[in-house]
Structure formats: structure tokens, C-alpha cells
Amino acid sequence: MRAEIVKDRVLVEKKAINEFYNNGYYGRPKSSGLELTLIEAVYLAFRGKIEVEHEGKVLEFSDLFKEASILQPSFELKYIVYKDLRERGFYVQPGVTDFRVYPRGSHPGKGAAKQFIYVRSERAPMPLRDLLRSLAAAENVRKQMVLAIVDEESDITFYDVKRPRLKGEMKEPLYPDINADATFLEDRVVVWDEEASKTLFENGFYGKPLDSQRLQLSLVESRYLLEKGVLNINNRQDESMDVDAFSKMASEIEPEFNLKSSVYTDLRDKGVVPKTGFKFGSHFRVYSQVESPTKIPHSEYLIHSIPMDHEFTLPVMSRAIRLANSVRKRMLYAILTDDGVDYIDIGRLKM
């Protein structure tokens, strides 16, 4: 069946509506015939269903593919994903991201699409803002957002992107009887009082004992407890530090301190227990509840804090998610926004 390229679409005669749309849900029926996207047209040409003309000449498949690549940015990436999904038995149509995909056993006219697919190359940085825009588009119509990353060998890895419901079971005491003294040393804080050290460690899983009487705290833990009025922190010259002075000094030691501290505070306020995730290459590992330091459960999440202008390097993101999966955790990214802290959960998905 003959078809013709018109701008960035391919038009097929009217009889194609019954053969391709009614039976395979390709394209969009128009009064003049069936309108296909370039991706749909190339796929149907690959299957030997249509021949495509351009400027009065029937194109060989290779010429059609090259022409489509000129007309549509990232054509080959999207074609690779489209072909893969079609050959898995899914019905696929253009969407507000790249594609919308119908669940197995369903199709246009029978049910709603389930997933929005967003296609990226492993080589291209992925701006966080682009990812959030695609996620919002999917959420607005209650669809699952799927990130399809095509590597240099044209293998596809699919990721589920969603907003997690982070809610812990820690009923955080405010420690009304504690107003302990602590010292900001070179890059951490030590609580000197034995009773306060014991209470903070055993009842909130803060810090790590320096010995049987004293507790050492991370910078983000220290700022949180200082802000809550639980600690009085002095520097090594025995000068009192308020939250601003502490944060300024901590930021000189750790450039990402303010970002991490905002996320730490938000996590504690959500009733979860964040601890360092250094051994996993992330900012935090997170527990829903810790009843006692002697009975530490499995942490459920790894969380890495990122600013709104962050750009994902996809091989790095893939490595982080693979590591999280290998230790039975979910990989979350914490995003500092004007309204607080937002979270996205990115995990591998089997289609």
C-alpha cells in the first residue's frame, strides 16, 4: 500500500483505516485517509505493509529511515523503543511525553492507556526539570510514568518513576528534659553528657557512641538538634553557636551541607530515621522505624539530595539504582524546592 510523507507525517489512502487502524491501532483516521507518525510509518514499512513516497520517489527502507531521522529529533531512539514495545504485544500510540502504552489485553476504544513512556539516550544528560515535567503530565491523567533509556548497543532499560509516600512510625520525642552541651570539633560534634548521649542514641537513633559516656553526631544531626533546642553547641574556642553560625561553618566543611540538612529535617519531620548512606554512595539510608539500636531493622530507602537545576548523568543514575536494588532498597531522590522537599522514586521495571 502506497503512502506519502507530508511535512512530519505520513498519509495513507482511506482503505488503510480498516487494515491498519481498526486492526492494529496505527495512526489517526482523517477525512483524507490515515495519518501516521514517522515512527509508525517506518515500522509498517519494515514489516512490508506500506511503501512510502517522498517528492515523487518511492523510498528504500534505509532512505526512509534516514529521512525520518532528519525530520524528527531522536527518531532512531524512539523507533527502537516503539518497535520493542510493539513486538512485545503492546498497543502503542503517540502521547504527551513520547508514547502512551495500553496494558496487555487492552487497546484504544476498549480501555485507557496505562503508561506514558519517556525516551532518552544513555549519553544525553537528563535535566531534572524535564523529568518532573513528564512525571506531572503522567500524574495529571493518572498514568504510570516509564523512563526508557537506550544504551549504545540499542538495549533498552525501563524505569518506573513515581512519587513515594514517605511516612515513618517514629513518634519523635522532643526531649523536654534535655538541654545538653556539645562541641563542634573539626568535622563533627560531640555530646559530653552521659545521660543525654544515651537518650539521644537509644530513643532517636542519633549519632554513634564515641565511648560509653559520650556521643558523636554528624553535622546534619547536630544542626537539627540545635534547631530543636535539644543541644547547646560551642566551637572549639568555647564560643556559643546559633543555627546560622553553625550552618555557615558546616557549609565550609561540606559544600552540600544546606541541601542535605534541609532533606534531613524533612525526613525526621516525616517520622523516618535517616542515617548516612555513604557506604552505598548516597546521602542517606532511611528506616521507617528503629525501636532500639540493638534491633536495627533493614533500611528501606537510599536517598540522594539534589537541587532543582540538577542534570542526571544516566550511567551514574543507573549504577545507583542497580546498587539500591542489589541491597533490597528503593532509590529515592530528594529535591529541594521553593515549597519544601519533594521526592521521586526511580526503580527498574520489567515491561
From Swiss-Prot:
Domain of life assignment: Archaea
Q: Which reaction does it catalyse?
A: pretRNA = a 3'-half-tRNA molecule with a 5'-OH end + a 5'-half-tRNA molecule with a 2',3'-cyclic phosphate end + an intron with a 2',3'-cyclic phosphate and a 5'-hydroxyl terminus
Q: Which Pfam families match?
A: tRNA_int_endo, tRNA_int_endo_N
Documented EC number(s): 4.6.1.16
**Matches recorded under InterPro entries:** tRNA_endonuc-like_dom_sf, tRNA_intron_Endo_cat-like_sf, tRNA_intron_Endonuc_cat-like, tRNA_intron_Endonuc_N, tRNA_intron_Endonuc_N_sf, tRNA_splic, tRNA_splic_arch_long
Q: Where is the active site?
A: 287, 298, 329
What's one GO BP annotation on this UniProt entry?
A: tRNA splicing, via endonucleolytic cleavage and ligation
Q: List GO terms (cellular component aspect).
A: cytoplasm
- Keyword Lyase in the entry? The reply is yes
Concerning HAMAP family, the annotation shows: EndA_long
Q: Which PANTHER family match?
A: TRNA-SPLICING ENDONUCLEASE SUBUNIT SEN2
Report the sequence similarity comment from the record: Belongs to the tRNA-intron endonuclease family. Archaeal long subfamily.
**Task of the protein:** Endonuclease that removes tRNA introns. Cleaves pre-tRNA at the 5'- and 3'-splice sites to release the intron. The products are an intron and two tRNA half-molecules bearing 2',3' cyclic phosphate and 5'-OH termini. Recognizes a pseudosymmetric substrate in which 2 bulged loops of 3 bases are separated by a stem of 4 bp.
Assembly information from the UniProt record: Homodimer.
The protein's name in its UniProt record: tRNA-splicing endonuclease
